[in-house]
A protein has these predicted regions:
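Catalytic cores of nucleic-acid endonucleases
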Residues: 69-113
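Short beta-strand or tight-loop elements
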Residues: 49-51, 90
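Active-site beta-strand-loop-beta-strand hairpin of nuclease catalytic cores
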Residues: 51-64
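Amphipathic coiled-coil/heptad-repeat helices and related helical stalk/stem segments
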Residues: 24, 49, 75-79
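Catalytic cores of RNA-modifying enzymes
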Residues: 40-46, 56
Length: 170
């Protein structure tokens, strides 16, 4: 008998995002996967802020991507400049119904349709200091591992069927 359900309905969705934001995120994650990048949604940073999507390249470059689904969403959110301290590149991501000219020119920009995305504008690089890189990379790894554990618990799968190293080094 289950005494406590720690996973809720779906361990991978926290329920704060609108359907439109989830659509943008899905398309963006498909593109990032094609770019051989891995991503963690809603990554809690040491400042206490949550990055909509954090991405890590095979070479260790860290990106923060803020998802904006309307003009109002962009207008009321003024916390995004703080994210520069936690990434090598800062991007926005949106969909076709949001005018692209509202986004700052000194940030990258993605356009997503839920089935994929493309880079409208690349983000300028502002490399993290080594200590900052280590802290954000560790937060990324811990969040990813924790969410994997919750997803496994929610599925009831013990993972006895596969090798513990399956998928590493690809």
């Amino acid at each position: 008998m289950t005494l406590l359900n720690i996973a809720g309905g779906n361990a991978l969705i926290d329920g704060r995002q609108s359907a439109r934001a989830m659509m943008v995120r899905k398309g963006l994650q498909i593109l990032l996967q094609d770019m051989r990048m891995v991503s963690v949604p809603e990554l809690v940073l040491s400042s206490g802020r949550r990055a909509d999507l954090a991405a890590l390249s095979p070479k260790g470059e860290l990106w923060v991507i803020e998802i904006k689904t309307s003009i109002e969403d962009f207008r009321v959110d003024r916390k995004w400049p703080e994210y520069r301290a936690f990434c090598d590149r800062l991007f926005f991501a949106t969909h076709k119904d949001v005018p692209l000219d509202i986004f700052p020119q000194d940030c990258g920009l993605f356009l997503s349709d839920g089935f994929g995305a493309h880079v409208v504008r690349d983000a300028p690089e502002h490399r993290l200091a080594p200590a900052g890189r280590k802290a954000v990379t560790l937060a990324f790894a811990r969040a990813a591992a924790h969410r994997l554990m919750l997803a496994e618990w929610a599925s009831g799968r013990s993972d006895d069927d596969s090798s513990p190293d399956e998928g590493l080094g690809e």
